[in-house]
């Protein structure tokens, strides 16, 4: 009897236990993870130092020159001849400490922008392909989806020609494909000829304003986009087309693809952001698609579909909240990869344009002076890269464990 009473009390204790959300439980597990807390502290210090330096510590890289103080070792105490240089100076007499701190802002910008590009484009594509692979869309859902898809794809020729209206033209092509499919049932096969030709002509004519080579490139891009938009949206066809494009991008080594994109666009921090963001799109697309396809097989999603809930309600109420955990973890680790990729591009001279401070560019400018004993010119930018990447990776590992529903107590 006593054993039975003990079990009953345990059930009662469980019944009256305070309800806790997934996010509260995740936060408690995160702060209990010492490794994750180390990563969180490193990330917070990195964010605070980069933000403070950018907004409250003015720095003009073009005027930060002192040829009489070239390659000085770290100096902690000022003298009559030399000022304080905590990290020493580089080949032009520039203070490495200030450049390292301000370079953190550029690395932070690259990480945030690149991950945002990858997450928004890849996440939306993965969400839509996974959700609508087995669910039929009505006319207005197809109309809105194809309009947005045409607009997104049209941003590529619009960016090449610097003419924003091209994105609007391809949005109209996407919307027109749905109308064509709905109201011209007897001529559906002709869309395979009409829309690719329309996309090629519109893109090529707009590209002629810039030059013949740009018109040729835009014509080919417009042809491919028009062919893609001519396909009926929904079902496995839409998913297969998007995923095969993602597979093609993944077939290239990420660093080589980023270098090729930057070489085509030209050097610069903004071009590096775009290149790193484009390379990361397939990762988020595949992750979001697999997560969505797993969630859509759950009983609560099938039940909501059975009772007639709208697709948008199912998508935003049942599916999207339940796929955020792996995406948040991937985005956190993606920040580390973006910072590392930006440093690699900067080291090769394809990132920030000198004299803009950036950790990879600082390494590329200073590694040749190691043989002369100027170790500080390489050590501190390298440590900054290592610590920031390590911090985001440790935090990402901790978030992955904290957000795992299998270990929720």
Protein language model regions, located:
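Transmembrane alpha-helices
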Residues: 105-121, 267, 293, 312-344, ...
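The feature captures the transmembrane alpha-helix scaffold of multi-pass secondary transporters
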Residues: 237-244, 256, 269-273, 315, ...
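Hydrophobic transmembrane alpha-helices
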Residues: 245, 251, 258-265, 274-284, ...
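Glycine-rich helix-loop "coupling/hinge" segments at transmembrane-helix boundaries
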Residues: 250, 261-266, 276-277, 290-292, ...
């Amino acid at each position: 009897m006593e054993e039975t009473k003990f079990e009953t009390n345990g059930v009662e204790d469980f019944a009256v236990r305070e309800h806790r959300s997934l996010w509260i439980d995740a936060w408690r597990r995160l702060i209990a993870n010492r490794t994750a807390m180390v990563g969180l502290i490193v990330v917070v210090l990195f964010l605070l130092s980069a933000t403070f330096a950018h907004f409250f510590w003015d720095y003009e890289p073009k005027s930060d020159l002192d040829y009489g103080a070239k390659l000085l070792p770290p100096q902690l105490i000022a003298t009559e001849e030399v000022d304080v240089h905590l990290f020493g100076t580089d080949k032009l007499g520039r203070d490495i400490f200030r450049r390292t701190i301000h370079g953190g802002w550029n690395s932070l910008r690259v990480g945030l922008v690149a991950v945002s590009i990858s997450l928004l484009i890849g996440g939306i594509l993965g969400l839509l392909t996974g959700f609508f692979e087995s669910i039929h869309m009505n006319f207005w859902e197809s109309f809105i989806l194809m309009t947005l898809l045409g607009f997104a794809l049209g941003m590529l020729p619009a960016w090449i020609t610097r003419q924003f209206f091209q994105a609007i033209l391809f949005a109209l092509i996407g919307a027109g494909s749905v109308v064509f499919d709905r109201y011209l049932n007897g001529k559906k096969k002709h869309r395979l000829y009409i829309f690719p030709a329309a996309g090629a002509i519109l893109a090529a004519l707009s590209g002629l304003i810039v030059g013949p080579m740009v018109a040729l490139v835009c014509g080919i891009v417009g042809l491919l986009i028009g062919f893609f938009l001519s396909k009926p949206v929904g079902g496995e066809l839409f998913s297969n087309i998007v995923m095969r494009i993602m597979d093609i991008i993944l077939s290239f080594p990420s660093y080589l693809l980023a270098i090729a994109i930057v070489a085509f666009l030209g050097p610069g921090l903004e071009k590096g952001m775009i290149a790193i963001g484009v390379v990361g799109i397939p990762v988020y697309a595949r992750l979001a698609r697999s997560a969505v396809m797993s969630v859509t097989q759950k009983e609560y999603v099938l039940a909501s579909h059975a009772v007639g809930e709208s697709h948008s309600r199912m998508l935003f109420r049942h599916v999207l909240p339940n796929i955020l955990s792996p995406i948040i973890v991937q985005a956190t680790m993606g920040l580390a990869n973006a910072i590392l990729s930006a440093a690699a591009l900067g080291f090769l001279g394809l990132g920030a344009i000198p004299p803009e401070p950036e950790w990879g560019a600082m390494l590329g400018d200073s590694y040749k002076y190691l043989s002369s004993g100027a170790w500080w010119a390489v050590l501190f930018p390298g440590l900054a890269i290592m610590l920031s990447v390590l911090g985001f990776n440790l935090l990402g590992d901790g978030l992955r464990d904290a957000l795992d529903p299998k270990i929720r107590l």
